[in-house]
């Protein structure tokens, strides 16, 4: 099963994702391949749609995953099927799960000010201020160059 994971890792790396994202996506496929070898005792190309649906229900039930996480797993199974197994994918056979939209809680200006003031280092204060005021992600701020500003 390692050759499937290696092929997946190679194909997914072509998408230009961060190392953290690549690791997470590989974790979904590793879990799937482990399930196939230990529970179904099948190769990935021999798995039916019914067995894929059972696996998704098993993920939701046994690991208590959120619908968002299950959708991410389905998305990676789709990529794996299309680009590693070179088999067609039918969205009607394994639809994405619905989930409730929610608004994230945002700290008040006073809370952010207290947090930034508590930071001992000027560099940390500058990075936190930039993240808060611009909406950049941590990885984006860490990779900023002087020319970018």
Label the model's feature ranges:
Residues 1-149:
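Conserved catalytic core of the tyrosine transesterase superfamily
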């Amino acid at each position: 099963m390692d050759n499937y994971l290696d092929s997946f890792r190679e194909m997914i790396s072509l998408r230009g994702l961060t190392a953290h994202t690549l690791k997470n996506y590989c974790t979904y496929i590793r879990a799937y391949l482990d399930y196939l070898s230990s529970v179904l005792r099948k190769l990935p190309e021999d798995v039916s749609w019914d067995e894929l649906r059972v696996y998704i229900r098993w993920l939701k039930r046994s690991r208590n995953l959120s619908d968002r996480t299950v959708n991410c797993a389905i998305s990676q199974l789709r990529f794996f099927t299309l680009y590693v197994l070179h088999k067609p994918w039918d969205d009607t056979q394994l639809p994405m799960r619905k989930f409730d939209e929610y608004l994230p809680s945002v700290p008040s200006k006073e809370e952010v000010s207290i947090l930034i003031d508590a930071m001992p280092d000027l560099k940390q204060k500058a990075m936190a201020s930039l993240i808060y005021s611009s909406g950049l992600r941590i990885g984006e701020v860490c990779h900023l160059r002087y020319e970018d500003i």
